[in-house]
Amino acid sequence: MVFNSTQDRQAKIVELLRDEQFLAIGRLTEHFQISVATARRDLSELHEAGLLRRTHGGAVSVTQVTQDKPNAARAVWNRAEKAAIAGVVAGMIVEGDTVLLDAGTTALEVAKKLADRRNLTFISNGLDIVEELTRGEGKSIYSVGGEYTETNRSFRGPLAEQFIRQFNVDKLILNAASIDVDRGLICTSSPVNASVARAMIEVSSRVIVVADHSKFTKSSLSVTARIEDVGVIVTDSGTRTIIETIPEKLRKKFVVAN
């Protein structure tokens, strides 16, 4: 499809994003019969105008910027992918580990895989996660206190951070609302959530980020950590194309669950 002006083409890009979650550079070059450089320039100009959000390899609608969604809603999204990720993460946990689980639906899937394991110590600020871990015997469980939020059924705030800083953790299972591979950032939906996550990172020897492919086509408000500063990011096969395009130094951080 050929458009006579840049303005017409960019207007059509914005229109397409109303119906599609993500527009890749390749999709734009084919649809509009333009070069990669022109497609990138269009997206950059529309990003500057606040009409879309530029992401690695394309763009998302500004309405795709993440906010907290209820756990019940998020639990059904990409369920198979989250279960596959959880299986890989469970294999990284060894007897005697102290494991801190960040509240979230992917970490909840990890808890389900670990609930019957013995000789482990668990800490979590997620109510659903703590409830899941009470299944089975032969382990220790610590529930983080603080201000309760019903949205993701978690405890957060200064009291939660103070409690977390009392521990020495072997492995942290950290959720991500989004991952910006262009800037090398792991993000979450609010400054409050980010502050709790940073407290978790401070006390943990190894940080294991869990994120399905949908987290790579979104944008979030608050930075939790840099990709280079975490141990590993476990994701699903839907991110293979994105991972192949990033620098090798960061690519080594990713483990793909099949």
Swiss-Prot record:
Q: Give a Pfam family name.
A: DeoRC
Q: Which PROSITE patterns match?
A: HTH_DEOR_1 (PS00894), HTH_DEOR_2 (PS51000)
**Which InterPro entries does the record cross-reference, listed alphabetically?**
Carb_Metab_HTH_regulators, DeoR-like_C, DeoR_HTH, NagB/RpiA_transferase-like, Tscrpt_reg_HTH_DeoR_CS, WH-like_DNA-bd_sf, WH_DNA-bd_sf
Q: Does the keyword Disulfide bond apply?
A: no
The record's keywords, sorted A to Z, are:
DNA-binding, Plasmid, Repressor, Transcription, Transcription regulation
User: Gene encoding it?
Assistant: accR
* Species this protein is from: Agrobacterium fabrum (strain C58 / ATCC 33970) (Agrobacterium tumefaciens (strain C58))
Report the protein name in the record: Transcriptional repressor AccR
The residues covered by the HTH deoR-type domain are: 6-61
What domain of life does the native source organism fall in? Bacteria
Q: Which GO terms describe its molecular function?
A: DNA binding; DNA-binding transcription factor activity
Q: What does this protein do?
A: Represses opine catabolism and conjugal transfer of the nopaline Ti plasmid pTiC58.
User: Which part of the chain engages DNA, per the record?
Assistant: 23-42
